[in-house]
Design a protein with these regions (language model features):
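A glycine-rich helix N-cap at a beta->alpha junction
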Residues: 95-112
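Short, electropositive alpha-helical surface patch
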Residues: 85, 89-97
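Conserved phosphate-binding/catalytic loop of the ribokinase/pfkB sugar-kinase fold
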Residues: 104-108, 117-144
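Short, hinge-like loop/turn segments at secondary-structure boundaries
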Residues: 27-28, 96-98, 122-124
Length: 144
């Protein structure tokens, strides 16, 4: 019997998590409900990103995070998700591979950028997420 290449293959949204600190006034200025997750469009994510302070950028998304966790526990994991040929796409691909997860999906050229989630952490530790799905849902119908 042939050896299996992977223990688990995950399919999901390839999202770059951008984690930074802010205060309640920052959230109010952008009408971001504290402690919630909201989907936003590209102009909003760009405005928030430009206004926020220093941040940590790392590959994320629930399925990608699960595959990284599996790999960290010694499993053989692969991830299928769409990124664009842009800086955030490069960050996602680098980080997921560095976590030991196989990621071979070709980056989309031109058009919609890579998905990202700005995770704003207030002094009390509350997280507020603003997520732009970007290119990740494009061509999703091919999977179903």
């Amino acid at each position: 019997m042939a050896e299996t290449r992977f223990d688990v293959v995950g399919i999901g949204n390839a999202i770059v998590d951008i984690i930074g600190r802010c205060d309640d006034d920052f959230l109010a200025r952008f009408d971001a409900p504290k402690g919630h997750m909201r989907l936003v469009e590209e102009p909003t994510i760009r405005e928030l990103y430009d206004a926020m302070g220093p941040a940590i950028e790392i590959s994320g998304g629930s399925v990608a995070n699960s595959m990284a966790g599996l790999s960290g526990l010694g499993g053989k994991a692969a991830f299928i998700g769409k990124v664009a040929k842009d800086t955030f796409g490069e960050i996602f691909a680098h980080d997921i591979r560095a976590a030991g997860v196989s990621f071979e999906t070709a980056a989309a050229d031109g058009g919609t950028p890579t998905a990202r989630s700005l995770i704003l952490v207030t002094p009390d530790g509350e997280r507020t997420m603003n997520t732009f799905l970007g290119v990740s849902p494009e061509d999703g119908c091919l999977l179903y």
